[in-house]
């Protein structure tokens, strides 16, 4: 069923369609002037959106992955091209990632991902897909679509190859989501089914029009929708209430190929801050959390590692330990002398 995402409304659809057809700077300037470069109301309930450029990426990708001033880092086989950033080429055993260097402290947000997956492989002879991340750790290569296993945060997976044999319940490519507190492993053999929050079929390979994915996190409500039919309409995919994500994590995207391969391209990542009205009761309920979790879904507990001691703290510990040690020796000597003196008196 076609739908408009939450309070996105017609403004974002109109703007995105124009940007997709013409990526020129002049058009972007006209759009900004037309909107007054200010916040846009995107629906009822006094919800406004603000584009956060420090967490966004679009053409011409100037400075991406180069120098300490870049907001985005490349990893592995990822390459900056003129029209896209290629995470992995259509070659075997490749791995690449793109990570934002700035931690995100937004309370409510929306990430729009413009991507393309294509290659020479025929049916079920391509892989493996890509992932979009909001995690505590960044730039950590691993087996989960090019990222580390047992991650802490949110992972959204566009899985293009079914690993599980006798798979009849779902059609691939398939989008799924997972929240992890660092205790869970992604089950490749079962395509992540034991730990997924939900999912949907998404036919996204070798399409001749733009494909989009949106991840929306508002009032601890996670919504994932897609625009993959060339109709500029959002379709429901995943909706999960009670998702608790800490602030200060990093956005990124990654991909991996094995014996099978595909081109995995990212055209743009656009993060919007959403300002949402909350009642006093909601303010109390929506306090910051320190580990990701999902209501009504028990995750194995993990013991948070103790933070490393600073130099000053270590000095204080050593100093006071020495003071206590010397004090104990002095007290021991005094008690020993008194004991010897009493022993001599008894002897005489």
From Swiss-Prot:
InterPro entries documented for this protein: ConA-like_dom_sf, Intracellular_Lectin-GPT, Lectin_leg
Subcellular localization is given as: Endoplasmic reticulum membrane; Golgi apparatus membrane
Source organism superkingdom = Eukaryota
Using the record's annotation, list all stretches that form the L-type lectin-like domain: 49-274
Q: Where does Ca(2+) bind?
A: 159, 161, 163, 191
Residues on Cytoplasmic side: 335-348
Q: Which residues are glycosylated?
A: 181
State the span of motif (Endoplasmic reticulum retention signal): 344-346
Listed binding positions for a carbohydrate are 93, 128, 161-163, 188, 258-260
Q: Which UniProt keywords apply?
A: Disulfide bond, Endoplasmic reticulum, Glycoprotein, Golgi apparatus, Lectin, Membrane, Metal-binding, Signal, Transmembrane, Transmembrane helix
Annotated signal sequence range? 1-38
| Topological domain spans for side Lumenal | 39-313
Entry membrane topology: Single-pass type I membrane protein
Q: Assign the protein's first listed, main location to one coarse class.
A: endoplasmic reticulum
Give the disulfide map: 200-237
**Membrane-crossing segments per the record:** 314-334
One biological-process term from Gene Ontology? endoplasmic reticulum to Golgi vesicle-mediated transport
Q: Which GO terms describe its cellular component?
A: COPII-coated ER to Golgi transport vesicle; endoplasmic reticulum membrane; endoplasmic reticulum-Golgi intermediate compartment; Golgi membrane
Per its record, what are the GO molecular function terms? D-mannose binding; metal ion binding
Query: In UniProt terms, what function does this protein have?
Result: May be involved in the regulation of export from the endoplasmic reticulum of a subset of glycoproteins. May function as a regulator of ERGIC-53.
Q: What's this protein's name?
A: VIP36-like protein
